[in-house]
């Protein structure tokens, strides 16, 4: 299955959408959309794929993803067990790049916001003091009203634009250029990793799942 293009909705493209997630496990497919997405994991763990990055995520993680960046968050299989009492809690903020660009006519502001959008196209894992400040403001976004929400959102943008407390996730120059054949392979590998989350998985195993040699598989993920 190739990454799906998801339409977040026209009304959202002119505003900010806040989604509070409380469910048994994460269910969104490998997908992308034309919005920026800020994800705060309050309670959950597993593996995430952002572009060509594959890594673990845990409680407290904060990630900014730019427009058209394929991504998926996969919970440990134990979350899906019928008797599991585990729950996912997260806050997700969607906002349009156009909304950011149109915030001000000041060229210096536009340049700063533009630079943030460019950085976000590789996915940013945010840590340190920047993370703590943003998480506090996301609480206001989720629970506040009116002008307080707008002020909190602008505060988040200010921190994201000014801070160096982040790590890139996807590699330099990554572009969403998956072919259907490539994405079928990726999906097979992702599903296998999800089912065998607690096991040590060898390169030979995942290469076989992708129907590739080990060396070809390594080149494929470069």
List the predicted regions and their residue ranges:
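Generic protein-terminus/edge-of-domain signal
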Residues: 1-64, 69-72, 76
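A hydrophobic/aromatic-rich effector-binding and dimerization subdomain
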Residues: 2-11, 67-136
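Short, solvent-exposed loop/helix junctions and linker helices
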Residues: 32, 150, 179-183
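A general secondary-structure signal for short beta-strands and their flanking turns/coil
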Residues: 33-35, 88, 153
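Residue-level recognition of the GNAT/N-acetyltransferase active site
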Residues: 51, 96, 194
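Short, flexible helix-adjacent loops and helix caps
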Residues: 78, 146, 197-198
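An amphipathic alpha-helical interaction segment
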Residues: 106-177
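Basic/polar phosphate-binding segments, predominantly the helix-turn-helix DNA-binding elements
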Residues: 166-182, 188-222
